[in-house]
């Protein structure tokens, strides 16, 4: 669609995509992917006077990060975060649990517990060391599994990415679009 409008674009696969069997994606961080995107900008600047970054979800977050560093002339963020990674995960859990009809009290208790647990993961604590005693019994098994999956370099870094802290540093034009019915990247 961009090419039909006379807009040049550079697309690339995620780091390690061509050799996915030997690459452990959980060891990469949002910062690593941001560096990958930043590496393309000097190449584009050789041919174009204005260079922007368009990204969806994590890519929208990366666009915000690059803009905050002054590396883009404009950005388009399609469902990128404008809050922290931790807040995003808690909000996604809240929306998913509410959508299946769980009582508000259960949702609130779970989200408060998972928020504290994610703080501990973000600070480097292992999933097996996190106390979830305040969690509703019915939700403990899925919580343990979720925390084990979150116990990775990628998630530890993601939890600490806080786009709200970057917004005041962005000086270029921004088009930020979010769908009202998209609960995954709200």
Kindly give the residue locations of the regions a language model identified.
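Conserved alpha/beta-hydrolase
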Residues: 2-19
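Accessory cap/linker subdomain of secreted extracellular hydrolases
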Residues: 78-168
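Acidic beta-to-alpha connecting loop that harbors the catalytic carboxylate
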Residues: 180-182
